[in-house]
């Protein structure tokens, strides 16, 4: 862990000094890893012979929200184990740390927003690839003080997001632009770390609003805040909850990655079909949530937005590239296919195995 911690320190210094000044205020600022990672992490990338034979995986998830329930279910219901995998789940909030851990070999697969994977790739980490997407839209709500009712009233206000470059940050900026507001000039955006911190900031009067995914939005609603808009209802196709790895890892351990995809797909089915078991697991991870909040979180994530097969989509990646064009000129010429490997989901789907689960 010493090497990883040392790298994170270097990464923080890099982003704080030159790189943040380059794209100040823009949502992809956390991923100025570029060529640094390609050279610095080469010594960590090689898997030992023992690792290559092992089915042990370290997999991260980026938030405590219903969006991560599929992964929790795969672990807690023994689905990973049933598919021959020994999985450690690690909570790592924020794209930079999980991406650094992936490229250093500390993690083999990461759960993250698609924007983190695409940004890392454009900045030089060309080996990263998106292999599955469980939510291909923005399942977030903008929650505000109750007296804010018109987009024009948002000008000059302060909003909380989990981090600059996070999905909550992207959602806020997307909404503001749709209302002809400039996210860098017309409002103040504060990275708060997590949804509980955003809610605390709103309660303390430090924030006028914040972006939440369920159940955070429901907790805010219960405290008297207003759902200004449900971003999911806008039908924006966007690779939001994704799983990524490296092409090298797929090449060296394709069968293992295939077992992960199969486990994920079984967990999706179990999430949809076993409500009592799913709620019990969600309660374990989403602490202090009452039953009504859990029920609504389940409805949104298991029944409303979750597909049967976790296909990454080119349109979902295209939306990310479009949003990056102003800060990363390379995004304009990039093709979505360069960031995605659909082959593992396709192989499982074409075998008829997914359809048979739902019969």
Task: Go through each PLM region and give its residues.
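Pocket-lining segment of extracytoplasmic ligand-binding domains
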Residues: 196-287
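N-terminal export leaders
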Residues: 19-20, 36
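Short, glycine-/small- and polar/acidic-enriched structural segments
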Residues: 50-194, 198-204, 208-214, 227-237
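Conserved C-terminal helix/tail region of periplasmic/extracytoplasmic solute-binding proteins
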Residues: 321-359
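Sec/Tat signal peptide C-region and signal peptidase I cleavage site
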Residues: 44-48
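Bacterial N-terminal signal peptides
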Residues: 28-43
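Secondary-structure end/capping motifs
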Residues: 251-332
